[in-house]
Amino acid sequence: MAKVNIKPLEDKLLVQIVEAETTTASGLVIPDTAKEKPQEATVVAVGPGRTDENGKRVPMDVAEGDVVIFSKYGGTEIKYAGEEYLILSQRDVLAVVEK
């Protein structure tokens, strides 16, 4: 994963989608029309966290390199330097995949 010159603001994350499998365990090819929208991504960059009502930063629950599962319809798709990314709010992240 290459370093990206995009720094998310507040409680935003920049993630790169983990591509879904194109074949089943038995070797059948899954056509694009039957694939579900992926919900797993690798965190590329993390914002500093939102500011609470007292002006203090609330730390982020995820870090660069984490693999996360996110809400199916969350985020904004962007293209940068020929790569596709998604900008998510921390609230769109449902879980961190433990290694």
Curated annotation (Swiss-Prot):
PROSITE patterns given in the database record: CHAPERONINS_CPN10 (PS00681)
A Pfam family matched in the record: Cpn10
Subcellular location, record wording: Cytoplasm
Keyword annotations: Chaperone, Cytoplasm
SMART domains cross-referenced by the UniProt entry: Cpn10 (SM00883)
Gene Ontology biological process: chaperone cofactor-dependent protein refolding
SUPFAM superfamilies: GroES-like (SSF50129)
Highest taxon of source: Bacteria
InterPro entries for this protein: Chaperonin_GroES, Chaperonin_GroES_sf, Chaprnonin_Cpn10_CS, GroES-like_sf
A GO CC term attached to the entry: cytoplasm
PANTHER family named in the record: 10 KDA HEAT SHOCK PROTEIN, CO-CHAPERONIN GROES
Entries under HAMAP family matching the protein: CH10 (MF_00580)
Family recorded in the similarity comment: Belongs to the GroES chaperonin family.
Subunit structure as annotated in this protein's UniProt entry: Heptamer of 7 subunits arranged in a ring. Interacts with the chaperonin GroEL.
Identification of the protein by name: Co-chaperonin GroES
Gene name for this UniProt entry: groES
